[in-house]
Amino acid sequence: MRWIGLSTGLVSAMLVAGLVACGSNSPASSPAGPTQGARSIVVFAAASLQSAFTQIGEQFKAGNPGVNVNFAFAGSSELATQLTQGATADVFASADTAQMDSVAKAGLLAGHPTNFATNTMVIVAAAGNPKKIRSFADLTRPGLNVVVCQPSVPCGSATRRIEDATGIHLNPVSEELSVTDVLNKVITGQADAGLVYVSDALSVATKVTCVRFPEAAGVVNVYAIAVLKRTSQPALARQFVAMVTAAAGRRILDQSGFAKP
């Protein structure tokens, strides 16, 4: 992956830290069912957490033999809506505090949420950057097909905040439900460029060119995680949250492009 607007030293540090392409970028599906007789937890998590949480889940299972971790990855607002409409899960991890607050206001949290990571936005362009995109303002050029997230989801809210702060308003050809949907449209050539989180751009390192822009630094999404009141495995749910926020989880989050809260 080529990075524009990012120092060579930082790119090298990211590569040394183990940032490699993620094998799958398909839309999230419902969690797989647990193995018969096994204890399991269901984790509803923002789509941007897919790579990091899959790795954390493997470590969690290794430390808890016989336990399954079943993930549902999707846009945070979609997951929050499912929870408030009666869906059952053990843990919720949101890409912003607003969606966590909506679940808290519905009385669905077993305790207080914990802020565990932050993320910022980056432009992803088709591999090689054939449209020569260099800045956020370039996304307004005539004839450029740009995709973003819907304003109702955290990545779309972040995009809107950047627009408001800069006075530069985009005219996207589509608004997607999650960052993975935005990435897929750029990777498959359905769009020339899109706005996603840094962590998601790193997960498709060989398939896109990333363009850093200074305006993104002023808009930071804070990720929150909490145990849900409807959990059937409260002890395991708390252990999973503890792993995410402890050193083992922090290492994986760092390697996946997330910053500390």
Swiss-Prot record:
Bilayer topology annotation: Lipid-anchor
Gene3D superfamilies: Periplasmic binding protein-like II
Source organism of this protein record: Mycobacterium tuberculosis (strain ATCC 25618 / H37Rv)
Lipidation (N-palmitoyl cysteine): 22
Alphabetically ordered keywords of this record: Cell membrane, Lipoprotein, Membrane, Metal-binding, Molybdenum, Palmitate, Signal, Transport, Tungsten
GO cellular component: plasma membrane
Residues making up the signal peptide according to the UniProt record: 1-21
Record: residues binding molybdate: 48, 76, 179, 197
Full protein name: Molybdate-binding protein ModA
Its biological purpose: Involved in the transport of molybdenum into the cell. Part of the binding-protein-dependent transport system ModABCD.
Source domain of life: Bacteria
Extra information: Was identified as a high-confidence drug target.
Quaternary structure, from the entry: The complex is composed of two ATP-binding proteins (ModC), two transmembrane proteins (ModB) and a solute-binding protein (ModA).
GO annotation, biological process: molybdate ion transport
Annotated InterPro entries: ModA, ModA/WtpA
One GO MF term attached to the UniProt entry: metal ion binding
Location(s) in or outside the cell: Cell membrane
PROSITE patterns linked: PROKAR_LIPOPROTEIN (PS51257)
Residues where lipid is bound covalently (S-diacylglycerol cysteine): 22
Coarse class of the protein's main subcellular location: membrane
Family from the record: Belongs to the bacterial solute-binding protein ModA family.
